[in-house]
Structure formats: structure tokens, C-alpha cells
């Protein structure tokens, strides 16, 4: 492939690990002065992108309506041809099915499995399997790779493991004292104790219950755990 021309497809760019990874990849390419594209239905994280190098094209790719997928696929195909895109990276199951409706001539497709995706019904399993039909797959851990190899009968060499990370420079190191004091006061945090932060959406598969099960087996007299999601934080003294 003589040139690298990437589009990432993600349902929304509001918040979350999938969205953060999409923005981080786009900004890395922008730092290298490599033009790239994102197709999304929108979101507040768009403002974090460098519009000199990253072009955002808004389409309703967050839709769960399968009847709308052929029309969306046609529009994506037109966008790909108009911009000479040759690599398509889908980051969610819905967009994967949309791409599967396209004729994928002259493009390579990649999908990231950000988790193993639950669901025991036939329809749910089929929906989840859409990601596996791309040319190459990324798994965020060895566990995810082993699980999807077994679940979808995939060849291991079709999957690359790329562990998730964070850009520590993104976080505000100079948080003012008043903001810190307000957080401590609002959540009744005893600062004399060790504070553990678990940042993730509160849901059954993010691991909070397993974490609590482990932490309660320790000496917890001097520990406070903070479970934090976007615009919401819960302090639990264990």
C-alpha cells in the first residue's frame, strides 16, 4: 500500500475508553502531520481534535436500526472514495455491520474488540460477531484475544494485542486547592486514609464488583475507594 489514509468509525465522541482511544490515535497522526478522518454521529470530544489534520464527517453511525444501515453504508462508501481512504478502523459493532454491507475493494479493514461482549441469544451473538469479519483485529488484552479466538473460531494470527494506556499529560496536574477541597467535602473523604480511585462507568462488566471482592479481603481500615464516572463520583469506605 503506497499511502496511509485512515478513517476511524465510532458511534459517538462523547466520553469513554473507545472514544478516548479514537481521539488519541487521531491526535497522534495530527502531530505527525498525517491527515486522517473520523466518521461519527457527533460528540463533545470533537473539540479535542486538530481540525487542520483530522476531518470529522458526521453520519448516524450510532443507529441500532438495521434498516438504516444500507443507506449509511452507501454514504460511507462515497466518503471513502471521495477522500481516497484505504484503511477503515471500526471501533464498535454497529459500524462493523455497516462496513460489512459495503464492497471493500481497495481498502483494508480493522476492528478493535474493546471487550468480549456478553449475550447468549442467537441474535446477540450474531451482532457481536460483526466485528470479527474485518481483515485484521485488535484485542485490548490477551484475555480478550483468547476469548474471541474461541468464541468466533478465529485464527490467532489475525489478531494483534494492543494493551490500552492513558496519556498522563492529558490530566490537569495543577488543580486548584478550592476544587480539591470541594471534592473532599462533597464526598466526605477522610484524607488521612489511603485513597484508591477506580475510574470507570458503573456497570456489571467493568469490574467494580470483583474489585470490591478483592479489596474486602485486605486490611481496609485505612482505605477509601472512589468509584468515578463522567460527572459522577461515589465514595465508599470499605
Where do the model's predicted regions map?
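A short helix/loop element that forms part of the nucleotide-sugar donor recognition site in Leloir-type
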Residues: 172-189
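A conserved nucleotide-sugar
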Residues: 33-36, 185-186, 190-194, 208-238
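Short His-centered aromatic/hydrophobic patch
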Residues: 89-96, 113
Amino acid at each position: 500500500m503506497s499511502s496511509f489514509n485512515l478513517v476511524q468509525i465510532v458511534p459517538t465522541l462523547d466520553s469513554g475508553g473507545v472514544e478516548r482511544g479514537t481521539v488519541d490515535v487521531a491526535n497522534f497522526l495530527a502531530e505527525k502531520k498525517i491527515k486522517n478522518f473520523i466518521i461519527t454521529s457527533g460528540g463533545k470530544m470533537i473539540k479535542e481534535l486538530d481540525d487542520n489534520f483530522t476531518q470529522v464527517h458526521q453520519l448516524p453511525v450510532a443507529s441500532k436500526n438495521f434498516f438504516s444501515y444500507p443507506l449509511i453504508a452507501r454514504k460511507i462508501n462515497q466518503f471513502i472514495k471521495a477522500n481516497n481512504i484505504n484503511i477503515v478502523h471500526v471501533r464498535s459493532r454497529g459500524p462493523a455491520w455497516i462496513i460489512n454491507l459495503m464492497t471493500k475493494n481497495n481498502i483494508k479493514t480493522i476492528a478493535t474488540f474493546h471487550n468480549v461482549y456478553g449475550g447468549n441469544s442467537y441474535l446477540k451473538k450474531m451482532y457481536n460477531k460483526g466485528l470479527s469479519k474485518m481483515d485484521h483485529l485488535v484485542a485490548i488484552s490477551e484475555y480478550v484475544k483468547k476469548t474471541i479466538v474461541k468464541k468466533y473460531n478465529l485464527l490467532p494470527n489475525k489478531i494483534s494485542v494492543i494493551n490500552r494506556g492513558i496519556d498522563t499529560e492529558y490530566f490537569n496536574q495543577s488543580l486548584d486547592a478550592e476544587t480539591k477541597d470541594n471534592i473532599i467535602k462533597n464526598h466526605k473523604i477522610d484524607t488521612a486514609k489511603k485513597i484508591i480511585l477506580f475510574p470507570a462507568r458503573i456497570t456489571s462488566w467493568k469490574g467494580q464488583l470483583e474489585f470490591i471482592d478483592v479489596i474486602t479481603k485486605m486490611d481496609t481500615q485505612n482505605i477509601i475507594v472512589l468509584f468515578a464516572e463522567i460527572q459522577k463520583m461515589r465514595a465508599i469506605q470499605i
